[in-house]
Regions:
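Non-catalytic signal-transmission and effector/linker regions of two-component phosphorelay proteins
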Residues: 1-13, 111-125
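Conserved acidic carboxylate
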Residues: 18
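Two-component/phosphorelay signaling modules centered on CheY-like receiver
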Residues: 21-40
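Acidic catalytic/metal-coordinating carboxylates
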Residues: 44, 68-73
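Active-site residues of response regulator receiver
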Residues: 63
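Hydrophobic/aromatic residues positioned on beta-strands within the core alpha/beta folds
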Residues: 86-88
């Protein structure tokens, strides 16, 4: 009799909050390539808040601005749930909401290695 292989580690489920369709699609593809599952994707504040409060996911990637609105309410909801998150921004750290400037930040445009590094940083806390 051969021993059974240990069960595969389930892929972490990611919430993607990004208002630009092409960037959102790129993120979803990159996450799949890294072995993650996209649990939900949101393109505007209402979708993002609904997902942040109710969806089942392990980690989130937040665009700093959703159609010109700061993403702070979504970050607040994630903090309330104890869910780690990474910001994605083209503005640099100065564009981050003040209370969240210590969070991992993925600078746009990003590459696969940078995405993986930031997600690992967020997961480890």
């Amino acid at each position: 009799m051969t021993p059974e292989a240990p069960p595969a580690t389930p892929a972490l489920r990611i919430l993607v909050v990004e208002d630009e369709l092409m960037i959102r699609m790129l993120l979803e593809d990159m996450l799949g390539e890294l072995g993650y599952t996209v649990a939900a994707a949101a393109a505007n504040m209402n979708e993002a808040l609904e997902a942040a409060k109710n969806a089942d996911f392990d980690l989130a990637i937040l665009d700093v601005n959703l159609n010109g609105e700061p993403v702070s309410p979504v970050a607040d909801a994630l903090v309330a749930r104890g869910v780690p998150f990474v910001f994605a921004t083209g503005y640099g750290e100065h564009g981050l909401p003040e209370p969240y400037r210590d969070r991992p930040t993925l600078k746009k445009p990003f590459q696969l290695e940078g995405l993986e590094r930031m997600l690992n940083s967020a997961i480890k806390g």
